[in-house]
A protein has these predicted regions:
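Short, small/polar-rich motifs associated with maturation and membrane association
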Residues: 1-155, 160-161, 166-169, 175, ...
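Long hydrophobic segments that form regular secondary structure
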Residues: 120-123, 244-249
């Protein structure tokens, strides 16, 4: 019997988290436990170590609103060297089909603009503080058919009550990620093998692309991308509440209740006019998958910490 070698992810005290569910702007700190302390707290789940992620909390002070925006683009710094049309014809490598095609360049999405927008709200007094953030991101990959869109929102609220005897922390977060995964490295491999005099487009074709069918080992890599759909959607909805009671003599009792709903959906479709459909006499092919996971956790602990002679600290935790 083997335990997982992957580290246990603990987000704001809730074990079993997923780093993909957190926006980078919301992370305050990341700590790694890899010694006996990991096993002492989390047991056999921590056999591969523990990654502790703490999200940002509000700071005391006036309510502040901030905005961060990013714009970016990508370029290929160095491309593979292949024969262009003139060299291909001059050396008599193959049949001259009349076109002049940069197959590698046809698959690139150079110059496309990616953007990211984040709005933060933070502030409050000693008794009640709030931190909230909203993020939207549209990332254009350098390859056609390799794009991603992300949306997320988070609210962290903290309360100190009864002269700091009682501390309450509330967290809720929603994140959604859409991924276009039509691209593949195999298409770039094919682009390096293609005849540079072959046509990319065909005005007589219903698709508009020169779809190469038959027994040839070569195919139009751009048509391969454009005549199919490969969408993946991830959704996370999380909420947790922590109640901490500060007791005399260095003792404290804490309980954390967490809830997480994760949904994952795949939608893949290949057109009836795609090369693989025509070669296989298919009228198109589709695939849809959906999964949903709900996790509920409860973590009660009792803590002890005392400082002796200003230099010596003794701490213990049980839970």
């Amino acid at each position: 019997i083997n335990a997982s070698s992957s580290p246990l992810i603990v987000i704001d005290g809730i074990p079993g988290g997923d780093l993909r569910s957190i926006s980078q702007e919301d992370i305050q700190s990341i700590d790694v436990l890899k010694d006996a302390s990991a096993g002492a707290i989390y047991g056999t789940r921590a056999a591969g170590g523990v990654i502790l992620v703490t999200t940002k909390k509000a700071k005391e002070g006036p309510i502040t609103l901030s905005y961060t925006g990013e714009l970016s683009t990508e370029q290929v710094s160095r491309r593979p060297q292949v024969l262009d049309r003139d060299a291909f014809v001059r050396f008599g490598v193959g049949t001259d089909l009349g076109a002049s095609t940069d197959w590698y360049g046809e698959l690139l999405n150079e110059g496309a603009l990616s953007q990211r927008h984040v709005v933060n709200l933070s502030g409050g007094g000693h008794t009640a503080k709030i931190y909230a953030t909203i993020m939207a991101q549209d990332q254009k990959g350098i390859a056609i058919g390799d794009n991603r869109k992300d949306y997320s929102g988070r609210i962290n609220a903290n309360f100190n009550l009864l002269d700091d005897l009682l501390e309450i922390g509330l967290h809720t977060e929603y994140r959604e990620a859409h991924r276009d995964q039509r691209s593949s490295s195999s298409y770039f491999d094919m682009a390096l093998k293609m005849n540079p005099t072959e046509h990319v487009y065909d005005s007589t074709s219903e698709t508009g692309y020169n779809v190469l069918v038959g027994g040839s080992e070569y195919y139009n890599p751009l048509a391969e991308v454009m005549l199919k759909q490969a969408d993946n959607v991830d959704k996370w909805l999380k909420a947790d509440a922590t109640v901490k009671l500060n007791l005399p003599a260095g003792f404290s009792a804490q309980a954390t209740l967490g809830w997480e709903d994760r949904q994952y959906q795949q939608t893949h479709y290949t057109s009836a006019l795609h090369r693989t459909s025509l070669n296989g006499s298919y009228k198109g092919r589709g695939f849809h998958a959906y999964s949903k996971t709900v996790n509920v956790s409860f973590e009660p602990t009792i803590n002890f910490m005392r400082v002796f002679a200003d230099d010596h600290t003794v701490s213990a935790v049980a839970g």
